[in-house]
Structure formats: C-alpha cells, structure tokens
A protein has these predicted regions:
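Polybasic low-complexity intrinsically disordered regions
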Residues: 1-119, 128
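Helix-centered, glycine/charged polyanion-binding patches within enzymatic domains
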Residues: 99-100, 105-171
Length: 171
C-alpha cells in the first residue's frame, strides 16, 4: 500500500529476451556499434538484437521508473537495440515538480538534463565520460553518491527476474 507521493524517481532499463530460437544468421554491427535489427529468426517481428556482456540477445528493453522504495510506477517497452537516452521523457510523465530523478549513465545527455530543468525536476543522472574527456574527481564522487540511491531499481529487476521468471517473454 502506497500512502504518500514519492520524493524521488529511480529510472533504469533491463533486457527481456524473447522466446525465440538461436541466431541463425550473421549479425551486422554498424559503425556506431548498433546491432542491425534485420536478422530476426523469430516469430516475434518487433524484437531486435542487442549485445550485453559480450552476448547477443533477441528481445526488448524495459525502461522502468520506481519510487525511492522500489515500487514500480511506470514502464516503457522498446526494441532491445534502442538507446536508453532517447526514452527518459515518457517515464517522467505525471511526476511532481521538485522530484529528484535518479538514472544511470545511459540516460546522460544534454537533452535529458534540459528536459529535467524545464519540468522543474532535480537532476540525479549519473555523468558519463566521453572520449578524451574523463570524468573529473567531483563527477566521480557524485556518481558514487548517486549509485547508493539507485540500487532500489536493480532490486526491483532482481525480484521480477527471480520470483516471477521475468527473464523471457512469451506469447
């Protein structure tokens, strides 16, 4: 039972594999590192390939917003090959002004920080280092501080995968 409004929103994404057969065709990777979605040996035509931990997976990406206690408030499902930074705004709909939004480095972009500022939300997005521009010591400390709050969304994913067999989509 949830009684009061949340003062924080924690956002992250997880991969949901489809119940498809193993890869039968070569996977093509473009110059940006995106996996081509054209090779889909599954009945599920909306699922796409992505690479995680060195393994290719066919499926979807679930973007999730939880409150500071880990209760899931909003979901947004996309094909697995989409990048996280493009899918922050649908998760922020209906959030109260002044709420702190915590998110991992995948959501770090100028557009997302601007969106938070326009909607009067507090920025808790971890900073990402770019080529030839490593993080400063202050940014590294900030990321370490923010990661201590973000664990609740990882616990929610763990519960979904472990208790409810959320690892594979079936239809």
């Amino acid at each position: 039972l949830k009684v009061e409004k949340a003062s924080a929103a924690v956002i992250d994404a997880t991969i949901i594999q489809t119940a498809g057969s193993k890869q039968r065709q070569a996977i093509e990777v473009d110059e940006e590192g995106q996996v081509s979605g054209q090779t889909t040996p599954s009945k599920d035509s909306d699922a796409r390939w992505t690479k995680k931990n060195g393994l290719y997976r066919l499926g979807y990406k679930q973007h999730t917003r939880t409150d500071e206690e880990g209760y899931i408030e909003k979901l947004h499902i996309t094909p697995a090959n989409t990048h996280e930074c493009n899918h922050l705004s649908p998760l922020l709909e209906g959030i109260a002004e002044g709420t702190t939004v915590y998110a991992d480095k995948g959501y770090d972009s100028t557009e997302n920080r601007q969106h938070l500022k326009e909607h009067r939300l507090l920025d808790g997005i971890m900073r990402k280092a770019h080529r030839n521009r490593p993080l400063t010591e202050a940014q590294t400390k900030r990321n370490r501080y923010l990661s201590k709050t973000r664990y609740v969304v990882e616990q929610s994913f763990g519960t979904l995968h472990r208790k409810f067999r959320y690892a594979r989509a079936a239809y």
